[in-house]
Amino acid sequence: MGLSTYVGIFLLCILTLSRCKSGKEEYGTVIGIDLGTTYSCVGVFKNGRVEIIANDQGNRITPSYVAFSGDGERLIGDAAKNQLTSNPKNTLFDAKRLIGRDYHDKDVQGDIKRYPFKVINKNNKPYMKVQVGSEEKGFAPEEVSAMVLSKMKEIAEAYLGTEVTHAVVTVPAYFNDAQRQATKDAGAIAGLTVLRIINEPTAAAIAYGLEKKDTEKNILVFDLGGGTFDVSLLTIDNGVFEVVATSGDTHLGGEDFDQRLIDYFVKLYKKKEGKDITKDDRAVQKLRREVEKAKRTLSTEHSTMIEIDNLFEGKDFSEPLTRARFEELNNDLFRSTLKPVMKVMEDSGLKKEDIDDIVLVGGSTRIPKIQQLVKEFFNGKEPIRGINPDEAVAYGAAVQAGVISGVEDTGDIVLLDVCPLTMGIETVGGVMTKLIPRNTVIPTKKSQIFSTAADNQPTVTIQVFEGERPMTKDNHFLGKFDLTGIPPAPRGLPQIEVTFEIDVNGILRVSAEDKGTGKKSNIVINKETNRITPEEIERMIQDAEKFSDQDKQVKERVEVRNDLESLAYSIKNQVKDKEKMGGKLSDDEIKTIEDAADEAIKWMENNPQAETSDYKKQKANLESVVQPIVSKLYEGAAPPPPTESTPKEEL
């Protein structure tokens, strides 16, 4: 690697940094989060090994779904996904497919057509619009991702019994700068300091390679999830994980395979019944739920039935689906996964026989046809089977989190990642002048001297792009800034040094200096149209805290209501029991208690949206009637037990 190509490459020897006890910042327990398109997963390095943490439903993966019920209650994870078919317009998902993108991006526009919720344009960003209680509210994808991250944080805290404030979060290797920045912003909104953003295939390689650090191997990681696809080629040598090449598609995954099935059955229904079910969001979401189940079934079976009660206008739906039909409908998408594989092989300069192991990651790699295509491409080589495709990324993130926080027993791990796209600036004629080629190891720094294009030019505009095309118009614009106050001089004479610096998270800082005057200007690329402002982040943090408070209030209201309901029915049942309390009270006393209990029950039926304080007041009223009567039974005996939220049988 010549000095002219890469200047100042700093290898990320995180082990050395983390083991340096003097001056090491204390982060507490650092968690690793795989923030997925369809499912997310959280892990922690503890007691010498990784623990993948189950949620409150006992599931080790949590749906990346957020929903708002009719009374404004917020649901996240399993609870949100479970009510998708009954509340489609207020159930948000796929934030990862929208995060860091322009509203007018063709992929975004394609997705909007199939979402049951509204997506609106706000400052050229896609905002997800739902009904929250009595008002409509738009959420940035960062906010929705933050809600999912806050759920993962909550899951970890419940398991660890302590507050968690720092995390390592994974992103697709092919995420661009704006998408990485937006993911960090989501962490901040969720109350997490994201210490490191690492690429998903790299995390998976750590999970795979943790036990195989003594041998040098070339590993190809094929990561096909719910919404994104990455291929990375790494070398592992004595605990050093070096990414050699990476490629992929940030808009390809299991959801696209589901959509092909939905389109197929929609056409089939229209042909048989003459009706278009796409006009009914609930029908489409019912179909989506069932085709996703069928897709999973077809990974182990050759055929299945799609059966839906009351799909559309009261009619049931029942159709067979074979694995062969599923493969035929998705044949082009399945085959398109091999293009990035070819790309990384070409970029790395390795032959197929040089690959020691193929690691399949992501739920979509369970599809037999995908496994077959990968195996055939590598001349019959079997992929590694001993790794859980759903948990591998979170596992690797947890190991990296352990390394950063200085946990013992993580071993001598060094992670050398790469930037996925070429970075450069626009020069005269719209030419893309490359400063940092793709697949350069990060962190890295590169400088180059430029000059003015006209005599006495007082200002130069530095326009920053990422991409592989020779002209900037075909690449992805990141941002621009001006260097002003250049003294009058003939064109070509001033020396303007432009420096690109990429940090360990793959985030770019560009600076320019007039070598004659020492005047400087710089930009941390945040693509104003694609990234939320610090003020917006602060507002979203406050909103997140407000929602957290609201969640607590809703939970308290439900608990107090349940207490009142339980008390009322329990008292009614006890006074009816002649063998127990009912046999010790007079008819008038029984009637007084029953009337009070009935009044409380009727009040609850008439006031379903009552506040917590109202329920407490009603409970106090009921207790004030019951307690004096019941107390008489205990005169001269031990005092009665207090009336609890769940009344004992002998009041």
Curated annotation (Swiss-Prot):
Main location: endoplasmic reticulum
Motif (Prevents secretion from ER) on chain: 648-651
Any GO MF annotation of the entry: ATP hydrolysis activity
Catalytic activity: ATP + H2O = ADP + phosphate + H(+)
Disulphide linkage map: none
SUPFAM superfamilies hit by this protein: Actin-like ATPase domain, Heat shock protein 70kD (HSP70), C-terminal subdomain, Heat shock protein 70kD (HSP70), peptide-binding domain
Regulation: The chaperone activity is regulated by ATP-induced allosteric coupling of the nucleotide-binding (NBD) and substrate-binding (SBD) domains. In the ADP-bound and nucleotide-free (apo) states, the two domains have little interaction. In contrast, in the ATP-bound state the two domains are tightly coupled, which results in drastically accelerated kinetics in both binding and release of polypeptide substrates. J domain-containing co-chaperones stimulate the ATPase activity and are required for efficient substrate recognition.
Role this protein plays: Endoplasmic reticulum chaperone that plays a key role in protein folding and quality control in the endoplasmic reticulum lumen. Involved in the correct folding of proteins and degradation of misfolded proteins. Acts as a key repressor of the unfolded protein response (UPR).
Protein's name according to its UniProt entry: Endoplasmic reticulum chaperone BiP
